[in-house]
Amino acid sequence: MQANQWQSVQNRTFTKWFNTKLSSRDLPSVFDLRKDLSDGILLIQLLEIIGDENLGRYNRNPRMRVHRLENVNKALEYIKSKGMPLTNIGPADIVDGNLKLILGLIWTLILRFTIADINEEGLTAKEGLLLWCQRKTANYHPEVDVQDFTRSWTNGLAFCALIHQHRPDLLDYNKLDKKNHRANMQLAFDIAQKSIGIPRLIEVEDVCDVDRPDERSIMTYVAEYFHAFSTLDKVETAARRVERFTEVLMSTHDMKIDYESRMKRLLGSIARMQEYWHTVQFENNYTDVKSHSNNFAKFKATEKREWVKEKIDLESLLGTIQTNLKTYQLRKYEPPAGLKIVDLERQWKDFLSEEANQSKLINTHMREIKESMRIAFADRANSFSKMLSTISNEITNLQGDWRDQLDHVEFLQEHLGPLEVELASVKVLYDNCFQAGIEENDYTMFSYEDLEHEFGITANIIANKIKYLENELLEREKRTLSKQELDGITKVFRHFEKKKSNMLNEVEFYAALASLGLVYDTEEGTALFHRAANSEEGVTYERFTEIVMEELEDRDSARQVLYAFCDVADGKSYVTSDDLLRSQVRPNIVKFLECNMNKHSEGLDYLTWIKQLLAEDKEIV
């Protein structure tokens, strides 16, 4: 492509880029860069849009040349103040319509404000954008081999690959006629404009089968793909976090209802049995006492065991509820008055006491029992029960992170073997008592079957707890970076580490993050760099890897959830149902949020809602 052809292509591309920025404020379009920029007004308006600053007063009706020069000079001075190099260009060049210098000026603005997310200097921006293209099209090699911003794009397949990689629902790459370059490129341009919102900055004939297309025009257009898909990835991640957070809340809500209902039922059953024991009457004969004894034994073998299991299950259920809330640093669940574990323990303690009294009442009528055998069995049974209770309490009061809890539960499981041996010894004593006709024991409330049952429950609880914790750890391990992803991060770090000091400066840090699809505005980027550098001159490889993992993984934290809602709400302080649905949050999730989230005059107040859910001693960090 000859110089005049490049200039013509750049003129069309840069004019379209210019107009996409002006259209955001419904400003008049540019038709001829040489004439329409000569009074400096549109140039100032463009800078106010892309720089998000007010340049102050300027001549809005510049009739004289000196007024036009003043306007253009104001724009150029602003550009210089932002550290952008301006070589051999002055106000007169713009006023006089020097197209070559005007195109160079616009290219400087494109580098700074469109590709500045990667770096402020063109060379690094080019390398970072090229590396992003290569990473995203790696699965389409060798048909797509992006080595530059000229010949690598002439068959249209690179554009199609970028779209298919991010939005496979819009384009079936495998059905493309790889030899029909013009049709492929036209298809990619149409989909990008109509379905993704990427402005059509270049034409098919500017790129398709051209020996060497204009590099700057293609870079400008490809940068629009970079920004569009980076935003798409961010919103999808945010929606996924919102869904997972809400699903945990919904599940926890159901568990709370289940806990309260079952707790009421268990406490009621215990109270009714206690009332029965208060009113029971004994007849002075063996048959009646034996009948009471049999009924009592039946109760212990059936209902009481169900209560023991239910009691342990309720304690475990409450622990699961608190673990779910703690995962997101939410406020601890406080059961209603009378339905707390302490209430159950108090009534259970009274129940056990009255159960013991009932047992003693029956046993007073059974004088044929040998005292020594009773004591021998009772001592071992009570000791075994205490050991089981100790293990149950250890499980109920687990603390620490997932790994610490798993290690502790596995430690408890190792003690089940000696307990099983001890249980066998208890059975020997129990069998001896049975053979001697000893059916009741005032020194213990436990039979061998009770202890065996509780031992089985405890063993099952431990096994289920281990399985639960292992699954949670496995899920968390799944969220970590794969070796391939870690290799990719290492490659990016080494690529931008220019001084080979195992450290990235601020410019290299921004470029490396952007090549991984992590883009921030100036304020966010600066804050992230200083946090990563930690008072050092730059960011080390270890800190860079940690930062990337923190930003890419789906962490369970209030801060991530808050940022997720902010992303779904497009930065607003409130989120609407349409925002949630548009981000592909499921309708049932949206309905739950509508019913439970604080109301805002224009939508749902997610910030206040999340703060209310936080534990009182927790902050969003």
Curated annotation (Swiss-Prot):
Q: What InterPro entries does this protein map onto?
A: Actinin_actin-bd_CS, CH_dom, CH_dom_sf, EF-hand-dom_pair, EF-hand_Ca_insen
Q: Tell whether Acetylation is among the UniProt keywords.
A: no
Q: Which GO terms describe its cellular component?
A: actin filament bundle; actomyosin contractile ring; cell projection; cortical actin cytoskeleton; mitotic actomyosin contractile ring
Q: Where is the Calponin-homology (CH) domain?
A: 8-114, 123-230
Keyword set, alphabetical order: Actin-binding, Calcium, Cytoplasm, Cytoskeleton, Repeat
Q: Which is an annotated GO molecular function term of this record? A: actin lateral binding
Instruction: State what this protein does.
Output: Binds to actin and is involved in actin-ring formation and organization. Plays a role in cytokinesis and is involved in septation.
Keyword Cytoplasm in record: yes
Q: Where is the segment annotated Actin-binding?
A: 86-110
Protein name as it appears in the record = Alpha-actinin-like protein 1
- Which branch of life, at top level? Eukaryota
| Family the UniProt entry places it in | Belongs to the alpha-actinin family.
Major site of localization recorded for this protein = cytoplasm
Please give a single GO biological process term from the UniProt record. actin crosslink formation
Q: What Gene3D superfamilies does the entry give?
A: 1.20.58.60, Calponin-like domain (1.10.418.10), EF-hand (1.10.238.10)
